[in-house]
From Swiss-Prot:
It is found in: Mitochondrion inner membrane. GO terms for biological process: intracellular copper ion homeostasis; mitochondrial cytochrome c oxidase assembly. GO terms for molecular function: copper chaperone activity; copper ion binding. One of its GO terms (cellular component) is mitochondrial inner membrane. This is Protein sco1. Cu cation binds at residues 130, 134, 222. Gene3D superfamilies: Glutaredoxin. Acts as a copper chaperone, transporting copper to the Cu(A) site on the cytochrome c oxidase subunit II (COX2). The gene is sco1. Keywords: Chaperone, Copper, Membrane, Metal-binding, Mitochondrion, Mitochondrion inner membrane. It comes from the Eukaryota. Its main location: mitochondrion. It comes from Schizosaccharomyces pombe (strain 972 / ATCC 24843) (Fission yeast). Pfam families: SCO1-SenC. Belongs to the SCO1/2 family.
Length: 263
């Protein structure tokens, strides 16, 4: 009985400490290889992930560099074109618009082109009985002058020259200009004086034939432009009816600042 128990005890002890399904070396090797392959896969995935992130960063950096280079070359191209344009203008000159004149201002004083040198001049041709175009353009001029005065100061003379001197004496001009910017200077004169200044600026104007300015009501057909002159009285640029007050102010301010830098 004791021997049976001893055998049974040994058998149980042997069974407990010995695995029912023994692991041979092949299984252990496969297990080790699996862990090794898993680690390799993890490292590969991590490397590929970092490689993908680096590729994205490289693409973004390349794109940003391309945009920066494009903007830089566009800026340089613009500067080159501006220099070329300046050389052309210096060679062939700007259109010969403007010139000497002697007219009467809306206060009744005789003035010449020399009285308006030292500042820029913004000149418009029209007449006081103009129903719509002239008032709109003078409103535009008034707004542009206000902008310029607020940004860079009092650097421009706004000038309104009549194309209808027979009906626009100084007093008529003064009353008409009360509705606009007080800085605007009205200029009138004899028919020949007005004809001469219009010819120098290539301004077209026409009045009906066989009329009496004191009795007949009529309209004057004329071209609609603003003429910007520099402080020496030389022509700079012309602006059509589609130009806004902001366009006028921007141009005046730009030319003023450009001249200021050159001094």
């Amino acid at each position: 009985m004791f021997r049976r128990g001893l055998v049974f005890s040994r058998h149980c002890h042997y069974s407990l400490i010995r695995p029912r399904f023994p692991l041979n070396r092949t299984c252990l090797a496969r297990f080790a290889d699996g862990r090794k392959n898993l680690a390799t896969d993890n490292r590969t995935q991590t490397y590929q992930s970092w490689r993908g992130m680096i590729s994205i960063r490289a693409l973004l950096l390349a794109a940003a560099t391309s945009v920066g280079l494009y903007a830089y070359f566009q800026h340089e191209k613009k500067k080159v074109l501006e220099r070329q344009n300046d050389k052309v203008l210096a060679t062939i000159g700007r259109p010969q618009l403007g010139g000497a004149f002697s007219l009467i201002d809306h206060h009744g004083n005789r003035v010449t082109d020399n009285d308006f040198k030292g500042k820029f001049s913004l000149i418009y041709f029209g007449f006081t009985r103009c129903p719509d175009i002239c008032p709109d353009e003078l409103d535009k001029m008034s707004a542009a002058i206000d902008i310029v005065n607020n940004v860079v100061g009092d650097v421009v003379y706004p000038i309104f020259i009549t194309c209808d001197p027979a009906r626009d004496p100084p007093q008529e001009m003064a009353e008409y200009l009360e509705d606009f910017n007080p800085k605007i200077v009205g200029l009138t004169g004899s028919y020949e004086e007005i004809k001469d200044i219009c010819k120098k600026f290539r301004v077209y104007f026409s009045t009906p034939k066989n009329i009496d300015p004191k009795k007949d009501d009529y309209l004057v057909d004329h071209s609609v432009f603003f003429y910007l002159m520099d402080p020496e009285g030389k022509f700079i640029e012309v602006f059509g009816r589609n130009s806004t007050s902001e366009d006028l102010a921007r141009a005046i301010g730009s030319y003023y600042l450009s001249r200021k830098k050159q001094k």
